[in-house]
Amino acid sequence: MRFAIAYYKNNLAGRNIIEQFKKLFFSPQIPIIELNKETIYSDDIDEKNYPELKNIDFLIFASTHKSKKGEPSLSLHSAGNWRSADLGGKPGKICRTSAFVLKYLFQKLEENAKNNKEIYEKYNITLEATHHGPFINIPNCFIELGSQENEWRDEKAAEVIAETISSLQNFDKKNYNWTPCIAIGGTHYCPNFNKIQLNSNYAISHIIPQYNFPVIEIMIKEAEEKTIENIENVLIDWKGCGKSEDRQKVLDLLEKTGLKYERTDRTEK
């Protein structure tokens, strides 16, 4: 797969990840874009402003992860805003992404972390729900190191992420017969979807968490249209949809749109 990496030059984790990537896997065939502003506000990323992105299939943003709890984490997620644009991007607009690339990267992130006992015991490897900017046309995702300065400077953790990014050189979607889907419900860190992304045949692209409820039709349409693969299936975190009436509204919408659904608690994982 032809991919590129982008990072903000003043972002500690992004810079650390890129340094490890260059040490281990640097290739002139993989463009590395150094941004002069934070990734989430870089809506100007396109072939016109960055000619090296011509013929690129996918863009990976390497960045910091921040959280109130400050737990060490290696995380992966799609970009976009289901509602307001408090952290870059556009309100109600999400980016294009690939369910297959996200599944592949998440499995590799888990695998590479497991190869380093210290990292695997310290860091939480997790998906995140779709959130924040930028809003660009190139299919993309974020891979992040967090959640505090000690972690942002952790070279071993950054190396795990660099290895994961590099593995995309060997990715060919023709080799996989996964079922692409979007996911609805649950918390921001998606424990039920994590298990499915790792262990089932489902490949998740965009995630609409419970805190972005109520789900409306345009959100589902956005998720469908902004997934490279053809979406016919939706995963539902059954207990992560609030009250029964909230869940029923989701089911009614899916029936209206003609999408099939599967409950996470009834999915092999």
Predicted feature descriptions by range:
Residues 1-137, 148, 155-159, 166-191, ...:
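N-terminal catalytic or cofactor-binding beta/alpha core of small enzyme domains
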